[in-house]
């Protein structure tokens, strides 16, 4: 298992158009301080993040879908078995119907997906769901991102421990300026406008946490990551609350 995880770090999937995003300018999270953080593995390869939103459901990006996935909860150090880890093989995926499955189209509209676990997660201090944000975030709000994505770009160096970074919600006009013609009302940009901090390859699908709730899902961004005036793009969760509730209830 440890050898497989080592291989995973060396063979993380590349992005399509917009790069799968990574955490630049991040520091190691305090172990299990983000108990909702999940890692998505295809075979032995860690390639996306996700967020536990109940004991049976995860929220992630639709472009993270694979024929089947392994989910790991309670994870911090990828090479060590530390006790609270839980492993699930998942096959029940619910991508938003508006998502364009042709990843070469560079269309990140409705880039959001629910994953149903085959059994209930065992909740503990290291495994806890995160509440969804019931309101849309405002520019200037301070938020937190986390993931095992690369900590350097364009030459990608991947961490073995979960990384965290504080970033800011940016004004919509800056998001449109950075990516003209690609930004819809259900997206938001976050990071530092001057660059140097934000998500990157391997962080896709992971959480943007604002005021202790899930406000965004990491969707995409520019390559190299965290360049000045090229912030990461997130799917704004507040626009999908009704859809999420409908899928989870039915």
Curated annotation (Swiss-Prot):
CDD domains linked: Tryp_SPc
SMART domains reported for this sequence: Tryp_SPc
EC identifiers of the protein: 3.4.21.-
Record keyword Protease present: yes
Pfam families, A to Z: Trypsin (PF00089)
Signal peptide limits: 1-15
GO CC terms: extracellular space; secretory granule
Gene3D superfamilies from the UniProt entry: Trypsin-like serine proteases (2.40.10.10)
Subcellular location: Secreted
Chief localization: secreted
GO biological process: protein maturation; proteolysis
Coiled coil region boundaries: none
UniProt entry keywords in alphabetical sequence: Disulfide bond, Glycoprotein, Hydrolase, Protease, Secreted, Serine protease, Signal
Domain Peptidase S1: from-to ranges: 23-249
Disulfide feature: 29-164, 48-64, 136-238, 143-210, 175-189, 200-225
Active site: 63, 111, 204
Tissues showing expression: Skin, thymus, trachea, cerebellum and spinal cord.
Residues with attached carbohydrate: 131, 166, 211
Keyword Disulfide bond: yes
One GO MF term: serine-type endopeptidase activity
Similarity comment: family membership: Belongs to the peptidase S1 family. Kallikrein subfamily.
PANTHER family linked: KALLIKREIN-9, KALLIKREIN-RELATED
Protein name: Kallikrein-9
């Amino acid at each position: 298992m440890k050898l497989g995880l080592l291989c995973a770090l060396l063979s993380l999937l590349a992005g399509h158009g917009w790069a799968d995003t990574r955490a630049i300018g991040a520091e190691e999270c305090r172990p299990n301080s983000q108990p909702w953080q999940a890692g998505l593995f295809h075979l032995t390869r860690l390639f996306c993040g996700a967020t536990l939103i109940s004991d049976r459901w995860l929220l992630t990006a639709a472009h993270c879908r694979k024929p089947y996935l392994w989910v790991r909860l309670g994870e911090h150090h990828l090479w060590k078995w530390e006790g609270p880890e839980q492993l699930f093989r998942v096959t029940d995926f619910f991508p938003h119907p508006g998502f364009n499955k042709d990843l070469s189209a560079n269309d990140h509209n409705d880039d959001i997906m629910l994953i149903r676990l085959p059994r209930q997660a065992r909740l503990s201090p290291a495994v806890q769901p995160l509440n969804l944000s019931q309101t849309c975030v405002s520019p200037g709000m301070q938020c937190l991102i986390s993931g095992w994505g690369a900590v350097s770009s364009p030459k990608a160096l991947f961490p073995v421990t979960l990384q965290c970074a504080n970033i800011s919600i940016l004004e919509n006009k800056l998001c449109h300026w950075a990516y003209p013609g690609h930004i819809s009302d259900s997206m938001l940009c976050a990071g530092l406008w001057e660059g140097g901090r934000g998500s990157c390859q391997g962080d896709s699908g992971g959480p943007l946490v604002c005021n202790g709730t899930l406000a965004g899902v990491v969707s995409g961004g520019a390559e190299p990551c965290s360049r000045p005036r090229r912030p990461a793009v997130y799917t704004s969760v507040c626009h999908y609350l009704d859809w999420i509730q409908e899928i989870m209830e039915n």
